[in-house]
Amino acid sequence: MIGDLLIFGTLLMNAGAVLNFKLKKRETQSQGFGDDSGSSSTGENIREFLLSLRYFRIFIALWNIFMMFCMIVLFGS
């Protein structure tokens, strides 16, 4: 059960890190008074999260190596 959850999380993180979509921040034009630039939508939050995953590719690679080691040593039968 724990092994399945760890594998699921690892695969999900890998999928987010290797996406090659051109994710750019949406440029909003300032409206002046009443500009609500502090709030962002769920889509923008997901986009920012996927962009941040790209910067952590080396750590994700190290996590993958650790998970392979755990799969062989701890979860192997």
UniProtKB/Swiss-Prot annotation:
It is a single-pass type I membrane protein. It comes from the Eukaryota. InterPro entries: SMIM7. Keywords: Membrane, Signal, Transmembrane, Transmembrane helix. Residues 1-17 form the signal peptide. Residues 77 are cytoplasmic. One of its GO terms (cellular component) is membrane. Residues 18-55 are extracellular. It is found in: Membrane. The chain crosses the membrane at residues 56-76. The keyword Transmembrane applies. Belongs to the SMIM7 family. This is Small integral membrane protein 7. It comes from Danio rerio.
